[in-house]
Amino acid sequence: MDRSQVKEIVDREIEPLMKRLGIDHWKVMVSYDPERIDGDGQIKHGECTRLVDYNSAHISLNPESFEDEPGVLKTLRHELFHVVLSPFDLYSSTVDRALDSPGPVREILDRVWTHSCEKAVINLERMFVNMSYAD
């Protein structure tokens, strides 16, 4: 999809979706960055960074990675679920400060953190989809 198509979907859906997820008090900025690759060489659909103390987030979407509207909406929800889980970012940032230097302990904790966060987001997505069918 091109940037304008993805932007149109996001502009239409983000506010109602944030309200449904209980995060409409957050300020979420969205940008569109094509062809971003993750550490494993896979094309990224989206990414979310959060400033939990300020209820502020930035979502970056890769328009070229989407084939259709359901794909855009799934990724948008996924990134917004990271905002829902943002209070746990305090734990992550505290551990980062406590472990000044890189090393095996930090690598293990980073791995556990990433896995736990992504699994929690996937579970929220499943919950959301099942609740939507009940509406």
Short names for language-model regions:
Residues 74-87:
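Active-site recognition of the HExxH zinc-binding catalytic motif
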Residues 1-70, 87-135:
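Metalloprotease/metallohydrolase-associated module, dominated by Zn2+-dependent proteases
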